Every structure is written in C-alpha cells, then in structure tokens.
Regions:
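Conserved phosphate/anionic-ligand binding catalytic regions in large, soluble enzymes, centered on
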Residues: 255-264
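Peripheral docking tails and interdomain loops at the edges
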Residues: 158-248
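Short acidic, glycine/serine/threonine-rich loops at helix termini
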Residues: 13-20, 119-121, 145-147, 170-174, ...
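Redox- and metal-dependent alpha/beta enzyme cores, enriched for Fe-S-associated oxidoreductases
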Residues: 103-130, 143-150
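Conformationally flexible catalytic loops at phosphate/diphosphate-handling active centers
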Residues: 2-98
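A general structural motif
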Residues: 77-93, 110-117, 137-145
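Glycine-/acidic-rich phosphate or pyrophosphate-binding loops and their flanking alpha/beta elements
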Residues: 83-106, 119, 239-251
Length: 265
C-alpha cells in the first residue's frame, strides 16, 4: 500500500482545480487481473484465513529481512509507471523533480504543498540574477538515494532540507537525515546541508518564509537547525522574515482572506 499525500488538514480543505483521470486510461496503467488477485487475498468471512497469529523469535528476524528485495525493487517499478503516466498525460513525474536554475548554488529539498510556494520564489530570485533551485521529493519511501543525487545540479554548494514534522531529541528530521546520508554515501562532502521545520499544525508558510531560507543559505555561518513561519523567542531557532518581501504572485492576481468560526469554514 502507498500513502499518496504528504500534507495535512489545511491543504485537504482547500478548493483547487484538478485534472481527473478517465478510468479507461487508468485501466491501461494497471494489470486488472493482478488487482483482482490482490483483492482476493483480503480477509473475508466467506473464505476465512488465519495469518500472522504467532511467530517465534528464532525466525522473526529472518522473516523481517526477507522483504528487503521487494523494497529495493520498488523505486524502479514506481519510475516505470511514472513514465507511463507522463507519456499518456504529458506530465513530468519522477522520483525526484528538479525546478530552478541549471547552475544553482543554493537548493531546497522538500515535498508537498510548500513546493508550489517555493517555485514562485525561485522564479522571482532567478529573474533577478540569483541561482537557486528546488528538489521535489515524489517518492519518500522507499528512498532512492542515487536518484536524489542525479536530481541535484553539480554546481550546488548548499542545501536546506525542509521537514513538516518534529522529532524531539533527534539530530534531525527524517527527510533531512535521508538527504545527509545520501550525500555522504555518494561522497558529496562538498555540499553543506542544513535542516528546517515548517507548517506544523497547518501553520502558514508564505513566500517570506522561503525567501528567508534562501537568505540563510547565503550566510557563511548558517543555522544547522531552524524553523520558519513562526517567531521562536524561546530557543531562537526561527529565521528572520521580511514581511515586506517581494510579491511573487502572477500579475493581476487578486488575494482575499475570509474569516470564519467552526462550521462557518
């Protein structure tokens, strides 16, 4: 099974324009006989089965490791089906998608809805002579480190990884640790990596927050761990944000804010 979304409550309640697939197109992507075979394995009182009732310690460890080949093969399978979708619908899905300057020196790695905000900021900064970019994570688990390395321009010197979670007591959040490990295993020790948190509890992450991240990457002495979108006056991890930052919205855009309470929303 796949979890096919990375965002929370606020995003799920937005009104967005979407492109809906025709089911006939979807059938072409799937082996429906395999789907039926998979569904037939589900627990059903009409043909009951017992599974996972007990397993001794002498074989449990071996059993857990035996699934490794399935996880190792999965990125290539996902990549194959993404290619089919791209061919059919004209999209550009990949395990990791890069957006920005081909010769970027500063890059953000993130996933989910913050990428849309980051793209607006990238367009503005690159149009004004800077060289920045974004790596969008499409497949988080299983993580494909070699594909991440391919997506990062060779010119990159500094990376900020943004996680929408907090792991108290850990040296970094999950995506940050994956990126650091992938770069270390690939011998890319020339890249400096910092990690930040954003959007907890559906906290807004406006363009000013993304501007702040790229500004932090300019510094010689960067905060290794930081937050954006809030003012942290306790542990002082938050980055300073310019509330009068440039307007990155498309020309002619009208922005409105509606206030409601409870069921009014």
């Amino acid at each position: 099974p796949f979890v096919n979304f990375f965002d929370g409550f606020r995003t799920s309640h937005e009104i967005q324009k979407i492109e809906k697939w025709d089911y006939e197109d979807l059938k072409e992507m799937c082996n429906m006989e395999a789907v039926e075979e998979f569904r037939a394995k589900a627990l059903n009182p009409e043909h009951p089965k017992m599974r996972g009732s007990h397993e001794n310690g002498d074989v449990f460890f071996q059993h857990r490791e035996a699934c490794n080949p399935a996880y190792e093969a999965l990125p290539a399978v996902v990549e194959k089906y993404m290619a089919k979708i791209n061919e059919k619908l004209g999209t550009n899905y990949d395990l990791f998608n890069y957006y920005g300057a081909e010769d970027a020196d500063r890059v953000i790695v993130a996933m989910g809805s913050i990428c849309d905000v980051a793209e607006e900021v990238i367009d503005y900064l690159n149009a004004h002579g800077e060289k920045v970019g974004l790596v969008k994570v499409r497949l988080f688990r299983p993580f494909a480190p070699e594909k991440l390395i391919e997506a990062i321009p060779a010119s990159v010197k500094k990376i900020a990884v943004l996680d929408r979670t907090k792991e108290p007591g850990a040296l970094g959040e999950p995506l940050y640790q994956d990126v650091v490990t992938a770069l270390a295993n690939a011998g890319r020790n020339d890249i400096q990596v910092i990690g930040g948190r954003y959007g907890l509890g559906s906290k807004d992450t406006p363009p000013a927050s993304v501007f702040a991240v790229y500004d932090e990457l300019k510094r010689d002495e960067m905060k290794r761990q930081f937050t954006i979108g809030i003012v942290d006056d306790v542990t002082n991890l938050s980055l300073p944000e310019d509330k009068n930052c440039p307007n990155t919205a498309a020309p002619g855009t009208i922005e409105c804010k509606f206030w409601g309470l409870g069921g009014d929303g």
